[in-house]
A protein has these predicted regions:
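Face-selective signature of the C-terminal outer-membrane beta-barrel domain
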Residues: 1-113, 191-200, 235-237, 243, ...
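Structural signature of Gram-negative outer-membrane beta-barrels, strongest in the C-terminal barrel
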Residues: 53, 76-202, 255, 292
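Transmembrane beta-strands of outer-membrane beta-barrel pores
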Residues: 10-14, 62-68, 95-97, 104-110, ...
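Gram-negative outer-membrane beta-barrel transporters
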Residues: 94-97, 199-202, 224-316
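Residues that define the transmembrane beta-barrel architecture of outer-membrane proteins
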Residues: 32-36, 79-85, 115-117, 173-177, ...
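Outer-membrane beta-barrel strand-turn architecture
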Residues: 1, 44-50, 92-97, 117, ...
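Membrane-embedded beta-barrel scaffold of Gram-negative outer-membrane proteins
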Residues: 3-19, 126, 134, 168-226, ...
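Conserved C-terminal beta-signal and adjacent last beta-strands/turns
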Residues: 135, 175, 250-256, 277-395
């Protein structure tokens, strides 16, 4: 069996913005962004490739992004054209208890001189229907270009702060390894599944932001995106699912993770502020759970929660006297949603729903205030306790 497919998409953004501090009348800006992607893919199933049946996949893709960002008050007029031509190929061999996938991707980025070669390997061992183990190796990269978050100008201490790219910025490369075991088992009328996974990612030339102080021309505070020596992200997670038909389902997971630079990096221009090896805004522990149930034919509900562990977060002076590194509390964010469905006729149903997001109002308590606040000093759940209702028609 052979399959050939093509795809394309296009998106245009025309955005007016204001990133001012102290009611600065010159802080208006305009951004135009055009992105389009086109590609094709071939998938073929063969009775034998070398030593076993296999599925072969190959494709080509082209991405183009044209960005023009103007902020006259900050003397910024940035034009960036990103063009990426890619080719990828992979082959998946399916044997009795072993599945092996080997693939590679080749990217030519116009902002990077050399071709980027990204291989990947995946081994799946499945000796029984209810048990499998997997090993994976993959690579990736981030190009030295301006990303959407770099266009936003923060307000710190009543002054604007912007992100710029360092001269000679190199691409960030990653090498990732992971291994997992997946076991499904039943007891009585309950079905359950347990997944245990370990992961390790080595980042080379990792991106980080360093504060440079004020720009002498625009007067804005500047953070520069630079290459660090490297970073390591590693840890383990466990996921468990248990269900009793549609009457009740529970899914929960927990992750232990360490995210560390190999060498300490500076985030503040204040010499009294220590450099850090721990990546900011990355908790060492996080988890989730979801419980859903349909006790009645027309009624169902779900209760979910997200746990976010403690982090370190940079806090720039302005509302506070000096730059400092904050140690945040942990958060447990609970959400409840109720649904009731009315059958209007054979072809139309009406669902009424309502609930509460962040039931116990687990929200940041030390937000900066006033015109001298640090607009980037924000962490934890994105919204306080929120009530909602809604309706949905469907067939």
């Amino acid at each position: 069996k052979h399959k050939l497919s093509f795809y394309s998409s296009i998106q245009h953004t025309d955005r007016n913005s204001y990133y001012g501090a102290q009611q600065d009348a010159n802080a208006y800006g305009k951004t135009k962004d055009l992105t389009w992607v086109a590609g094709g893919m071939y998938v073929g199933n063969f009775e034998k490739v070398l030593f076993s049946p296999a599925t072969f996949t190959a494709g080509l893709e082209y991405q183009n992004n044209s960005l023009h960002d103007i902020m006259t008050g900050y003397h910024r007029d940035m034009e960036q054209d990103v063009r990426i031509a890619s080719a990828f190929v992979q082959n998946e061999w399916k044997m009795n208890v072993l599945t092996m996938l080997v693939g590679a991707r080749l990217d030519k980025h116009n902002l990077i001189d050399k071709l980027i070669f990204s291989p990947r390997v995946n081994l799946l061992y499945k000796p029984a229907d209810d048990f499998q183990a997997r090993l994976t190796y993959s690579t990736g990269f981030r190009a030295p270009q301006a990303y959407d978050e770099d266009l936003h100008v923060a307000a710190v201490g009543g002054e604007a702060m912007e992100v710029r790219l360092a001269e000679g910025l190199k691409p960030e490369r990653s090498n990732s390894f992971s291994g997992s075991v997946d076991w499904s088992f039943n007891f009585g009328h309950f079905q359950s599944n347990l997944l245990i996974e370990g992961f390790y990612t080595a980042l080379n030339d990792v991106f980080y932001l360093e504060s440079l102080g004020k720009d002498p021309v625009s007067g804005t505070l500047v953070q520069e995106r630079r290459n660090g020596n490297g970073a390591r992200v590693y840890g383990a997670n466990i996921d468990y699912k248990i269900a009793h038909g549609k009457e009740a389902q529970l899914q929960l997971g927990f992750t232990v993770q360490r995210s560390r630079y190999t060498e300490a990096v500076r985030w503040s221009e204040d010499e009294d502020v220590a450099a850090i090896k721990r990546m900011p805004r990355t908790p060492d522990y996080y988890g989730y759970f979801t419980f859903s149930s349909a006790p009645l034919k027309n009624f169902d509900f779900s209760l979910s929660g997200v746990y976010t562990g403690r982090m370190i977060v940079p806090h720039f002076a302005g509302y506070i006297e000096k730059d400092r590194l904050e140690h945040t509390p942990d958060f447990m964010d609970f959400n409840l949603k109720l649904n009731y469905t009315f059958v209007l006729n054979d072809h139309l149903k009406l669902q009424v729903n309502g609930g509460v997001q962040n039931i116990f109002n687990a929200f940041q308590k030390d937000l900066d205030k006033g015109m001298n606040r640090d607009s980037k000093y924000f962490y934890g759940p994105t919204q306080p306790r929120t009530y909602f209702i809604g309706i949905k028609f469907f067939n």
